[in-house]
């Protein structure tokens, strides 16, 4: 049981912290408030990517018309369903119109409570760090009553703004290896990234799903982090991580994806079975995290760039596949299931790889009847014309998605 005064203490601590702390730079993607009269805005993303800060920025704008409650506060760890009544009383006493509910998905039956508050005409913005919990519970009780928003670590432009830098090959390379986690960008202490990695594994996966084979899960996560941009299949990595059951690996990969630590991109195929059994490509949530947890001498810079391009595309597109025919195209962007854009990634085009990169992209252009494509590089500009169409070569730091 949680006392009313405990809720008041948590609310006051949140208010004071937001009033005194640096709430950082504005994000490129604002919270979609235009539909908030009847819908809850649900901000999801990996831990420490800036969800709470984004909520704090909104709180500052709203001032006294809002309540900010951090449900991961230690004083609220024993929250039960019976505590909702006292929480309601506290909210009513404050006369708030906006409820900013940070990490509310850890509460029992939270989605029922949010639905009730929507029916009472509160404007609600919530955050969460687990895609599975959010999607399952939102689909049950908040179907048609929520606006989803995914938040990622800082983009290149946000990185530049935070650091007061300008676009250049040098600042791009700095971003490539440091990534976009806000706290790490302020300190440069790689121990923060290692601690974040372990925190996600423990809190979002091991504890939440009751994983017993902790060492094997650690090996899987480390293996994936060190192989971003590569294809993999569960049967082929069983021996490397000392796990016998393919289904166990598949389940763990789903948990890792639900925590936003990794994304898995499937091969484009018009056959559902072919798509399911084909190897997937793995990408980390952040290139700085991947670099910090890899053996630097063995880091493939091209794969790191490919990972960065994937993150940039995911900021704008939800349907992303790869193409694999006689050649390969790294990214096929779809809209309503229809391929609309094609991207190839190559750190540096040279006589040894140029034909392979162009051939793979042109094959995809012909396959999908798309007369244009892009090759994203570190620092090369060019344009190629062929019977398949036009290919623009663009450095990442000049690329405007």
Features from the language model and the residues they span:
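Interdomain hinge/linker elements that couple catalytic modules in large macromolecular machines
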Residues: 2-18, 152-311, 315-325
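Loop/turn-to-beta-strand initiation segments
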Residues: 95-98, 120-125
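Conserved ATPase-coupling elements of RecA-like P-loop NTPase cores
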Residues: 79, 105-114, 136-137
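Short regulatory helix/loop adjacent to the ATP-binding pocket of P-loop NTPases
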Residues: 132-147
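A cross-kingdom feature that marks ATP-driven nucleic-acid transaction machinery
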Residues: 2-23, 34-44, 48, 53, ...
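Short glycine-rich substrate-engagement loop in P-loop NTPases that contacts/grips substrate
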Residues: 67-95
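Structural recognition of the conserved hydrophobic beta-strand(s) that form the central parallel beta-sheet
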Residues: 123-129, 150
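Conserved P-loop NTPase "ATPase switch" module shared by AAA+ and STAND
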Residues: 92-110
């Amino acid at each position: 049981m949680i006392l009313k005064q405990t809720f008041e203490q948590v609310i006051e601590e949140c208010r004071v912290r937001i009033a005194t702390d640096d709430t950082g730079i504005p994000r490129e993607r604002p919270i979609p408030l235009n539909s908030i009269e009847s819908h809850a805005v649900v901000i999801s993303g990996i831990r420490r990517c800036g969800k709470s800060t984004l909520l704090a920025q909104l709180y500052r704008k709203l001032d006294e018309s809002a309540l900010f409650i951090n449900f991961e506060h230690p004083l609220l760890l024993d929250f039960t369903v019976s505590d909702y009544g006292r929480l309601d009383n506290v909210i009513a006493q404050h006369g708030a119109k906006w409820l900013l509910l940070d990490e509310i998905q850890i509460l029992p039956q939270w989605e029922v409570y949010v639905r009730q508050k929507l029916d009472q005409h509160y404007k609600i913005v919530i955050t969460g760090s687990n895609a599975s919990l959010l999607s399952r519970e939102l689909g049950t009780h908040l179907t048609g009553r929520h606006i989803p928003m995914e938040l990622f670590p800082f983009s290149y432009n946000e990185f530049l703004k935070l650091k007061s830098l300008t676009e250049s090959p040098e600042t791009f390379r700095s971003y490539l290896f440091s990534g976009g986690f806000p706290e790490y960008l302020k300190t440069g202490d790689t121990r923060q990234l290692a601690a974040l990695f372990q925190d996600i594994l423990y809190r979002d996966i091991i504890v939440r799903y009751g994983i017993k084979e902790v060492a094997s899960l650690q090996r899987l996560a480390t293996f994936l982090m060190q192989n971003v941009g590569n294809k993999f299949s569960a049967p082929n990595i069983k021996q490397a991580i000392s796990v016998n059951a393919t289904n166990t690996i598949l389940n763990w990969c789903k948990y890792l994806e639900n925590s936003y630590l990794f994304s898995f991109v499937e091969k484009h195929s018009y056959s559902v079975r072919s798509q399911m059994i084909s190897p997937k490509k793995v990408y980390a949530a952040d290139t700085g995290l991947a670099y910090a947890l890899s053996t630097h001498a063995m880091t493939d810079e091209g794969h790191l760039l490919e990972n960065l391009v994937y993150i940039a595309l995911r900021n704008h597109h939800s349907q992303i596949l790869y193409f694999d025919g006689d050649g390969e195209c790294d990214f096929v962007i779809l809209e309503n299931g229809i391929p609309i854009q094609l991207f190839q990634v190559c750190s540096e085009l040279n006589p040894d790889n140029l034909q392979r990169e162009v051939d793979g992209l042109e094959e995809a252009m012909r396959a999908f009847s798309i007369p244009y494509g892009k090759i994203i590089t570190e620092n090369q500009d060019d344009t190629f014309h062929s019977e398949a169409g036009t290919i623009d070569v663009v450095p990442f730091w000049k690329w405007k998605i």
